[in-house]
Amino acid sequence: PMTQEEVDGKTIYTVNNGDLVACFAENITDNVVKAMAEKQPLRVIFRDNCFAQDADKINIYETFKQKMDWSDQEVVQNIRVI
């Protein structure tokens, strides 16, 4: 099943109770990224234009490393920016 929730006006999609969490909205906030990480997903997808700056994109990896206790390798394997 797929569910949707709004955080800071941005839609977060969750598939199969957290097997996959995705957001495709532009200019997402830290709150959106944190809400996604709190779902403890196996895989995460963002659209490239979710981020206003390249630094914002780098920050998602750090957020997931902290919230999920993922290693550098797990972050690279489990997060996709398309």
Regions found by a protein language model. Name each.
Residues 1-82:
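Accessory, often C-terminal, charged low-complexity segments
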